[in-house]
């Protein structure tokens, strides 16, 4: 009788544990899902260049996957302030993913391609420095490329660098490691 009762209890316990055994735990080799950081940009002061900044956001969104650009909403913060003036296009980067960019009419009046300018300036916010190669294929060559250049997309190396800078967690990035010095705001001119 005691044995029969013990077997019954054991069978009941095993019956309760069976569903737990059937559920497989994720394997250690499973790829962690990448975290995508969203940066919000504000075009309320972009004047006649709003469409160019939206196009720059689309260019970057179609080129990289670790960071996404979205227009500011009523509930979001602002990472990127966008302004327009009569000077030269430029970016003031306060930290990776944050800063202020200007569409300067001087470059537009000289004939530089507006979507290339806006995509280039956002590149600075995404951690890319100027690289004065003079090549149209290099987005970050900026105004060193010919005025006739219409390439508004980052090349493979530029895309890879942005992916690397935004890979991993959503935690704050050390701006010194991202290429900025002393926590100061850095200015890049097209």
Locate the predicted segments by residue.
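Secretory targeting and sorting signals
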Residues: 1-30
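Metalloprotease/metallohydrolase-associated module, dominated by Zn2+-dependent proteases
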Residues: 2, 108, 113, 129-190
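Acidic/histidine-rich, surface-exposed loop or edge segments in extracytoplasmic proteins
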Residues: 32-45, 103, 142-145
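A short alpha-helix/helix-coil micro-patch that ends at or immediately precedes a cysteine
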Residues: 39-70
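Extracytoplasmic/secreted envelope proteins and their assembly/folding machinery
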Residues: 50-57, 115-119, 137, 159, ...
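Active-site recognition of the HExxH zinc-binding catalytic motif
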Residues: 60, 116-130
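Short, well-ordered secondary-structure micro-motifs within conserved domains or adaptor modules
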Residues: 67-92, 98-102
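Short pre-active-site segment immediately N-terminal to the catalytic Zn-binding motif
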Residues: 101-119
């Amino acid at each position: 009788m005691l044995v029969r009762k013990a077997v019954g209890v054991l069978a009941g316990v095993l019956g309760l544990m069976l569903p737990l055994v059937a559920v497989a735990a994720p394997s250690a080799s499973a790829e962690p899902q990448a975290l995508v950081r969203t940066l919000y940009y504000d075009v309320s002061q972009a004047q006649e260049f709003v469409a160019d900044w939206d196009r720059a956001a689309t260019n970057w969104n179609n080129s990289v996957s670790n960071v996404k650009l979205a227009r500011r909403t009523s509930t979001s913060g602002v990472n990127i302030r966008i302004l327009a003036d009569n000077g030269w296009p430029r970016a003031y980067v306060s930290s990776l993913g944050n800063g202020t960019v200007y569409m300067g009419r001087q470059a537009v009046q000289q004939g530089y391609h507006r979507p290339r300018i806006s995509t280039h300036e956002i590149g600075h916010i995404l951690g890319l420095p100027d690289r004065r190669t003079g090549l149209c294929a290099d987005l970050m060559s900026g105004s060193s490329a010919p005025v006739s250049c219409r390439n508004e997309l980052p090349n493979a190396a530029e895309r890879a660098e942005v992916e690397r800078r935004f890979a991993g967690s959503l935690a704050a990035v050390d701006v010194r490691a991202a290429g900025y010095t002393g926590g100061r705001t850095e200015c890049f001119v097209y």
